[in-house]
A protein has these predicted regions:
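Extended, low-hydrophobicity, polar/charged segments
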Residues: 1-114
């Protein structure tokens, strides 16, 4: 088991959530790729969208169904500060995951999630 998957497993176990973690043999960079790989509808996939607070630099995580988009203006209203795009390096630094593979749990640093 990779270190990334071990962090996800530890986070789930710590929250007393019993889920099977699937390792995909092929790319699941998009929600559509993930849905095809497991044989489900795109909206049954959870997508992790990360923004960076313009004033604070802190990252903020939004979870949404795979077929949905997160509206940056609405996300800004929810968070209460202007949000910008988080780049790949910041996402990996904060979560330990690469873009396209950010799990909803098991991040390297605590992240506010909505």
């Amino acid at each position: 088991m990779s270190q990334s998957l071990a962090r996800v497993r530890a986070a789930l176990d710590g929250a007393r959530v019993s889920l099977e973690i699937l390792e995909m043999p092929d790319s699941t960079r998009t929600a559509a790729d993930a849905a095809r790989a497991v044989g489900c509808a795109v909206d049954q996939i959870v997508k992790s969208i990360i923004f960076r607070g313009e004033g604070t630099g802190h990252v903020v995580l939004f979870l949404t169904a795979g077929g949905n988009q997160v509206d940056p203006a609405r996300a800004t209203a929810v968070v209460g500060q202007p949000l910008g795009k988080a780049d790949a390096a910041l996402i990996r630094e904060q979560t330990g995951f690469a873009i396209g593979g950010v799990a909803p749990v098991g991040h390297l640093r605590p992240i506010t999630a909505f």
